[in-house]
Amino acid sequence: MNNEHRLEAAPALQDKDESIYQALMTAIVEHQLPPGSKLPEEALAEVFAVSRTGIRKVLQRLAAVQLVTLTPKRGAHVTSPSVEESQAIFRTRALLEVANLPDVIARCQPPHLAALENIIQREQQAHEAHDGPAAIRHSADFHIQLQAISGNPVLTEMVTRLSQRSSLVIAAWGAPWRQGCRCDDHQQLVGLLRDKALQPLSEALMHHFDHIVASLCFERDGVSLPDFSRLFAGHKES
């Protein structure tokens, strides 16, 4: 392969790696790959039609954001957070998100409120359709967009990563997707934000996290090897 062809191939490989990364991350965050699920390089390489080296790079990226755990001689599996880690994740989210509310209130404008209302509507529709992955996605997006109003990209990135790990916690400890965030909680938060009521808003957000943690059942079921061919159908051709 000459230099010109190498230059053309590099972006294509990067795009493929990113596509696989996003597909696996979405499957993990939306509970299609439960905590503890094995992620064999050979099986994933076959499904995505790439080399094991390519899959290994993606798994290392997922491990860097703590969605995948890499164990020597045992390979990769979806991270299964402990009780202590699970509680710490939600405690950290509560501290960060509540502390950021003054900046959220200060910068909030009607278009922000409309965007949050739209997310709640889509979340409610997902619940009514029993679409667990969509409900999880919209619930996380609500919190991320709420915090993004503050204009603090560093904190928003932290909330995004913690929201992904929160999804793992809910999947790991037996609370069905419908027992995570509640639409009526989110609606209450928007109402208090509209009123610029900092103290009630802070208390409501803290209570919201308390409710999520209280809904968890800290007992773990066994896991089996997922059907990767079904789960990622269509990615081989992309």
Features from the language model and the residues they span:
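Long, hydrophobic, amphipathic alpha-helical segments used as structural scaffolds
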Residues: 104-108, 150-154, 158, 170-177, ...
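Hydrophobic residues in alpha-helical segments
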Residues: 28, 104, 127-128, 150, ...
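Mobile beta-alpha loop/short-helix "lid" or hinge segments that flank ligand
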Residues: 64, 68-69, 162-164, 178-180
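Conserved amphipathic alpha-helical segments that form helical-bundle/coiled-coil interaction surfaces
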Residues: 85, 89, 110-171, 183-191, ...
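C-terminal regulatory/effector modules of DNA-binding transcriptional regulators
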Residues: 177-238
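Short linear motifs at protein or domain termini
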Residues: 1-102, 106, 213, 217-238
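Short helix-capping and inter-helix turn/linker motifs at the boundaries of alpha-helical repeat units
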Residues: 15, 113-114, 177-181
